[in-house]
């Protein structure tokens, strides 16, 4: 006997974590329809707390609650850092957001990193002599 219902409704949790904020965006499998979208800045008062793991945790749990109300029971997770010219590693809120989604009761499918990595990039800002401070 299976523990879960035969047909699970799957979704995709897109977690964008920079050093300034954390976005948790849950969509259907195609990514076309938004189910829930919460950011760290929406759940804390002070701007300096937006990138914190606490803000990411609260944002992820709120998004999870909205998604469960819409019937999503299992999710794949896509983690993204700024990438390109910016940092290629996710910010401090990424891990907290993943843990919060797991604790919310979702069945976790795949966790993948979708940070845009340039293969021979365009020129970085700053010019030939660099950024003069």
Curated annotation (Swiss-Prot):
**Functional description taken from the UniProt entry:** Located on the platform of the 30S subunit.
Keyword Ribonucleoprotein part of the UniProt annotation: yes
CC per GO annotation? ribonucleoprotein complex; ribosome
- Name-wise, this protein is Small ribosomal subunit protein uS11
- Oligomer and partners: Part of the 30S ribosomal subunit.
- Write out the similarity annotation: Belongs to the universal ribosomal protein uS11 family.
* Keywords, comma-separated and alphabetical: Ribonucleoprotein, Ribosomal protein, RNA-binding, rRNA-binding
Write down the PANTHER family for this protein, in alphabetical order.
Answer: 40S RIBOSOMAL PROTEIN S14/30S RIBOSOMAL PROTEIN S11
InterPro entries noted in UniProt: Ribosomal_uS11 (IPR001971), Ribosomal_uS11_archaeal (IPR019961), Ribosomal_uS11_CS (IPR018102), Ribosomal_uS11_sf (IPR036967)
Q: Name one GO molecular function term.
A: rRNA binding
In the record, biological process GO terms are:
translation
Q: Which organism is it from?
A: Aeropyrum pernix (strain ATCC 700893 / DSM 11879 / JCM 9820 / NBRC 100138 / K1)
User: What would be one Pfam family of this protein?
Assistant: Ribosomal_S11
